[in-house]
Amino acid sequence: MSAASAPAVDTARAWETVLQRIESDLIAGALTPGDHLPSERALAAELGVGRSSVREALRVLEVLGLIRTQTGSGPQSGAIIISRPSGGMTALVRLQVAAHGFAVRDVVKTRLVLESDVVTELARASGAAPTPALAPALEILDAMEQPGDELTRDEFLTLDQAFHLALAVASGNEVIAAMMAGLRESIEAYVRVGASVLPSWDDTSTRLKAEHRAIVAAIEAGDPELARTRIRDHIETYHAETNVSSIHPHREDT
Amino acid sequence: MSAASAPAVDTARAWETVLQRIESDLIAGALTPGDHLPSERALAAELGVGRSSVREALRVLEVLGLIRTQTGSGPQSGAIIISRPSGGMTALVRLQVAAHGFAVRDVVKTRLVLESDVVTELARASGAAPTPALAPALEILDAMEQPGDELTRDEFLTLDQAFHLALAVASGNEVIAAMMAGLRESIEAYVRVGASVLPSWDDTSTRLKAEHRAIVAAIEAGDPELARTRIRDHIETYHAETNVSSIHPHREDT
DNA sequence: GCTACCGTGTGGTCAGACCACATGGTCGGA
DNA sequence: TCCGACCATGTGGTCTGACCACACGGTAGC
């Protein structure tokens, strides 16, 4: 039913067995965030594989945002289980965009779909009771509006990204938050290029700030439909203005 | 302004330089799907790094669904650029679920959000003009209803997954399709466990088939709201019935 | 003409050797 | 007693070289 006989099973490549071992330890609860993995040399000896194979598996886990590695000795050294899905999501989406697997247009559209749901859920929750989870997002808005301290485009965009991410986090769905972060970061280069060619940045940033406040207002008013409409307009307007969707990772010339 | 002097810049780890090189080649169009990467040994020599570092980078690309490797010689050997985004999504989400980064509940919820948008878009498009893109999905439904040929639960679930994926593909947004596939696959183990404990599989499968037809009917009728409602009920009912969301990767006992 | 063979290049793996680094203990002096 | 310098230890990061299994493609022999 399961394995035919005794042999085989070993058909997987060495680094895959390492990955499987770690995954099963995670599922079994033998490994939880904060724990240290055994050292590469110990893992290699324990699993009967070479250290290079262990390293290939750890590299994958690192890129996927599951572990953090550090040299040296002490409590902070070695490979430690973390859980930072957004990092892996970013790398995944960005490379897929680069490889033509994803169109920038679809990335923007997907982000819109996810974020629409985020604000809808937040508005629903806020209609029932005040939402303290929104506090981080509000702080970011305050930071964006500091009088007398003009932000550069880059600084503004950084805060803008943080605001949208804060909304996603506030909704409580980590999967959506990670995906949104990944989608956004993966096209960040295009967004920044788009912002740099805008004729009047002052006008744009002023409008964006107003739209952010309006979105939050709709959420706090407990109006899902309004919040949804506003986030949609917010995203679509910006991307239409900067023409981000038409930017193509490929250079057709030369 | 940028680099202090001549040195440094090399601060990135060796395997990262390999990754960056490949990414930039992808963006520049020097590498497109179907192309062969240079051999590991050539890449190592060219970039001035060890072969093991090259391998770590290639391993990442493989897990992320960007390349396919094959031993031997000939046209099919070596590392070839592909673009299978769902593979990377699956690995990422599955491991994050295992590491407690993602809750199964949130995965299901996110899938629901994405799929709601898929059927909404399909219904809108279908309202304007017939949608030939739905053909693959319809074929799968036919296969699920073959009379006299009772499908096992596993076979049924495989077709079920294919149906939902076909809908996503029909919507034309590859990012959403890939993410949905990844989300679905990552919790497939839990879904199958849930199905295996259902009291009356015949009743369930009959109901699911009817629901599938109803969803398609709503799409073809060009009724976005109805399609949205039906897909939501379809997914929520099933997951409530099988209690998938409550399945926890951890075993609290022993 | 066909078959069997073998050279060649590929990824897959392992072993061993360094390196830089961060820690934590030890030893010496104040 | 206290404190600073020192160094042994263990970690990840990297490179080198060596095999292996495999798949192709040409070649020699039938």
Identify the function of each model-found stretch:
Chain A
Residues 1-3, 224-254:
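C-terminal effector-binding regulatory domain of bacterial HTH transcription factors
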Residues 1-113, 120, 124, 250-254:
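Short linear motifs at protein or domain termini
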Residues 25, 29, 88, 186-194, ...:
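A short secondary-structure junction motif
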Residues 107, 111-193, 212-214, 226-238:
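Conserved amphipathic alpha-helical segments that form helical-bundle/coiled-coil interaction surfaces
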Residues 154, 205-206:
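Short helix-capping and inter-helix turn/linker motifs at the boundaries of alpha-helical repeat units
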Residues 194-205:
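Extended hydrophobic/aromatic segments used for targeting, binding, or gating
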Residues 220-221:
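Well-ordered alpha/beta subsegment
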